[in-house]
Structures are given as C-alpha cells and as structure tokens.
C-alpha cells in the first residue's frame, strides 16, 4: 500500500512538473512570438501618439509645464544670479521608453518568480508614463536604449530593451522620439535643460537586420541628433566655449550659465564598447553631438565632462572630488525596479550628484504609485 501511494504521489508530482514545464514553454514561445512581431504595434502606437500630441499642442487649451512647482529654488532668480549648469540637480528616469510587457511575458515572469520563491525578480510589470508625460512632470533626464537596424545601407535606430523578448516601447523609432522631445520643447520654451542619456547595444541577436553599434553607426547617429534637434542641441562645442578641453573649462569653473542653456537638450553617450573610438574622432569632443559619459577613474582626462557613478554610496564618497573640486557632472541611480530601500534613497538624496535616476518617478498616469523625488522636487539647487 505504501509503495503504491509513493508511486501515485511521484506520478502526480511528475505530472505537475511536466504541466508546469509545458505552460512555461507555451508562455515562452508566445512571448517570443509576440515580441518578434511587435514592431508594427510599436510603430502604430508611436505614430498615433505623435498625432495626438500635435493636435493637443496646436490648440488654445495647452498650458506649458510649470516646472517652478517642482524646483526647490527660484529658477528665474537663479538665472539672473548666474547659476551655472553644473550647479543644479535634476531627477531622471531609467528605461524611459518602457511600456508594459506583453501579457504572456508578464505571466511567464510571474510564474517563474513564484516557482523560484522570488529568486528571479518580477520586473515584467515595469512601465513608465510616455516621454512627454515625464517631461510634463518636470523629469529632466531621460535614458533610452538603442538598437541599430541596417537593411543593406538603410540605417535606422530603434528604442527597445530587447528587440524580441521585451519589445514594448513608447518611442520605437529614435528619430521620432527626438521629434516628440523637440515638440514638447517647442511648446515649453525656456525649460530647464533636458539630459538625454543614450545606451547603445554592442551585442545584438542576428535577426531583423540588427547590427552591433559601431563607430560608423555612431557617426550616423550624430547626424540624426543634429537633424532632429537643430539649434535645440546643447552641444559639446557650446559648452566648451573658448576652452581647448573640458578639463581646462572645469579647472576655470566655466560651465555655461544656466540661463544660456534653458530650452536646450544635451545628449550623453553612455560608456560602451565604442566610447574610445568616438572620442578619437575629435579628442576635444568639440565636433561631436554627444558628451561621452565616463567613469570616476577617468576624471582627470582632458575630455571628461560627465561621469557615471551608478552606486549612490560611491557618489557620496566621491562627491567632494567629482562635483565640488573637479566640477564634473555626475549621474547616479537611486534604485532599480526590483530593488529599492530607504537607505539607498537617503544616499541618493544626499549624494550631491547632478542627475539622479529612478524607476519610481512622480507619475501622471498613476500618481499614487510609490515615488522617489529629490526631497519632494525634481529640480534642485546644489550651491
């Protein structure tokens, strides 16, 4: 009787395990299938969203964003007093383009999270407001991931976390994403400068004409930026001014005045596999469209202006050197979607970095969600 019971129990357990495996495989195939063919959905979403924005902007009812409400200082007075670009801090977002994952992926990751007792984090429910909604909430740093598509010389850049498995995005076509940001900027003249952080993908799956981001593609990417942003671009050339290098500019405490940067958009290139090649195009960075974001160990190089210090504890530790003495602009992260803590938030608020990124910004769509801010603000004076 006992042997029979054990045998029956083992059969039942095996049956449950096989059923779970079958469900996981179905969800995996379904997720990949939807993700692979989700491009048309992304394109349709973006086109309709842009048309909607244009219809809203060009009416008498649109009211520009009141970013003064989200600043802990008088912006007009700060501009009059000569506050510099590197003397303010702004709140940013991570994966700023992210839409809710497709249904089967949410089911798949949730199931895996349950099976592994939480060891595999459930990040499938992460999404953000649209880029425009974030800008309306006075978010002044956006971060997007770039994939390169090269169809026999027809080069495009798309915005996605994963071109197959996690392909839901609010701004699929990069040039149209810039159009959306520029459109908002047009209708919010004199806004606090926006930092657009670009993270290109060096390794990509060999599908959909995707290619690794190379220096040749970076040159094309610069052209897209200049074409889309025009005189809205806060360029390295403008920031350098009369100086031969960023190091010289920083040593003379000569970041441009905030008032001269209002209404502009600076594009930052996340440290990646082609950073050195991008710098080598012109080591002064004067002729490039993007500012290379380097690491703390690169702080004394002549072309260093922005650095990544994603750990807020390290940002606190190095603040006196990086922000106060060396006058670089520092970006750190307060959290990620699957991990946040009061301790980390306290560090992020106190670190003195110029750009603090969060996965939990103030939201227009779900305002009661958990949020992180800079002491209740998204724009802060560091002086």
Residue ranges and their predicted role:
Residues 12-17, 21-383:
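Catalytic cores of phosphodiester-bond hydrolases, prominently lipid phosphodiesterases
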Residues 1-9:
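N-terminal Lys/Arg-rich, disordered targeting/topogenic segments
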């Amino acid at each position: 009787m006992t042997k029979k019971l054990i045998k029956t129990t083992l059969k039942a357990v095996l049956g449950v395990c096989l059923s779970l495996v079958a469900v996981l495989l179905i969800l995996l195939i379904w997720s990949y299938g939807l993700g692979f063919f989700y491009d048309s959905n992304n394109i349709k979403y973006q086109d309709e969203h842009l048309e909607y924005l244009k219809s809203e902007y060009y009416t008498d009812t649109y009211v520009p964003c009141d970013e003064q409400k989200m600043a802990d200082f008088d912006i007009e007075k700060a501009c009059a007093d000569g506050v510099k670009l590197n003397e303010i801090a702004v709140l940013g977002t991570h994966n700023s383009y992210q839409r809710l994952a497709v249904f089967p992926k949410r089911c798949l990751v949730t199931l895996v999270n349950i099976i592994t007792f939480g060891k595999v984090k459930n990040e499938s429910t992460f999404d953000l407001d649209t880029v425009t909604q974030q800008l309306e909430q006075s978010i002044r740093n956006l971060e997007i991931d770039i994939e390169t598509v090269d169809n026999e010389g027809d080069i495009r850049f798309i915005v996605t976390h994963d071109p197959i498995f996690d392909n839901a995005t609010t701004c699929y076509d990069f040039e149209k994403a810039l159009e959306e940001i520029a459109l908002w900027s047009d209708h919010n003249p004199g806004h606090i400068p926006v930092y657009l952080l670009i993270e290109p993908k060096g390794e990509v799956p060999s599908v959909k004409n995707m290619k690794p981001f190379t220096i040749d593609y970076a040159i094309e990417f610069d052209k897209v930026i200049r074409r889309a942003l025009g005189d809205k671009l806060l360029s390295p050339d403008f920031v350098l001014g009369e100086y031969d290098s960023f190091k010289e500019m920083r040593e003379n405490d000569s970041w441009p005045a905030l008032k001269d940067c209002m209404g502009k958009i600076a594009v930052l290139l996340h440290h990646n596999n082609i950073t050195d090649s991008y710098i080598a195009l012109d080591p002064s960075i004067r002729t490039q469209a993007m500012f290379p974001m380097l690491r703390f160990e690169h702080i004394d190089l002549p072309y260093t202006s922005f650095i990544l210090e994603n750990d807020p504890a390290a940002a606190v530790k190095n603040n006196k050197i990086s922000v106060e003495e060396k006058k670089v602009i520092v970006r750190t992260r307060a959290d990620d979607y699957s991990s946040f803590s009061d301790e980390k938030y306290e560090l992020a608020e106190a670190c003195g970095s110029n750009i603090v990124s969060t996965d939990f910004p103030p939201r227009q769509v779900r305002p009661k969600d958990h949020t992180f801010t800079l002491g209740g603000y998204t724009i802060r004076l560091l002086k």
